[in-house]
A protein has these predicted regions:
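Acidic beta-to-alpha connecting loop that harbors the catalytic carboxylate
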Residues: 137-139, 166-168
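Alpha/beta-hydrolase-fold serine-hydrolase catalytic core, especially in secreted/extracellular enzymes
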Residues: 157, 189-196
Length: 196
């Protein structure tokens, strides 16, 4: 539908956290449809991740159950787990919980199982598009080493790695979210490189 309505064959894609894994997997599977790709709060192999180490303690639960609890405490923990709660206005976490919980307090376990037992889900060598890798400098979902391992294998030289200061796992909700939007806009609006 997008191709039909816009008459375009390629599009920019943006994903954050498990959505970043999905966006990268799409870019790997359908590279002809991806113009520029922005991956925020992404994890590659999970090597050294304190968040995934804690989450892995429940891997057998994730294998045995197709749903997990996502209650108010869990939603608030997204904003506090990286020991930088001061980078958020917790009223945002509460507003998010208020809206999400209208639809229930259960979500599929699939992404948690994938992140604790099935990484890596994406092969960076199979993503030919330009890529922006953006992370909060306090994000516990992935280490810098894990992310640089992914970044260095990307085949396209049109790539950037951006670390946002005083920011944790959810930069789009953080007090410094303007830095995320600035970096994203700059990358998506970049001129097309001229071949040498």
């Amino acid at each position: 539908m997008l191709q039909r309505e816009t008459k375009r064959s390629k599009f920019h894609f943006y994903g954050t956290s498990s959505g970043a894994i999905r966006a990268a997997a799409f870019a790997q599977a359908q590279p002809e449809a991806v113009d520029r790709l922005v991956l925020v709060a992404f994890t590659y192999k999970g090597t050294g991740s304190p968040t995934l180490r804690d989450r892995a303690k429940q891997v057998e639960f994730y294998r045995a159950n197709n749903r997990r609890t996502r209650d108010r405490a869990m939603i608030r923990s997204i904003f506090t787990r990286d020991n930088l709660a001061s980078s958020y206005d917790m009223a945002v976490a509460d507003a998010m919980a208020d809206e999400e919980l209208k639809f229930g307090d259960q979500v599929p376990t699939g992404t948690y199982l994938d992140m604790t037992a099935n990484l890596p889900l994406v092969d960076p060598t199979k993503i030919p598009s330009p890529v922006a890798r953006i992370r909060g400098d306090h994000d516990g979902i992935a280490t810098m080493g894990d992310l640089f391992d992914f970044y260095r294998q990307l085949p396209n030289g049109d790539r950037v790695f951006i670390s946002l200061p005083n920011t944790a796992h959810s930069p789009g909700f953080a007090n410094n979210r303007h830095l995320l939007w600035y970096a994203t806009h700059a990358f998506l609006a970049a001129p097309t490189p001229v071949a040498g």
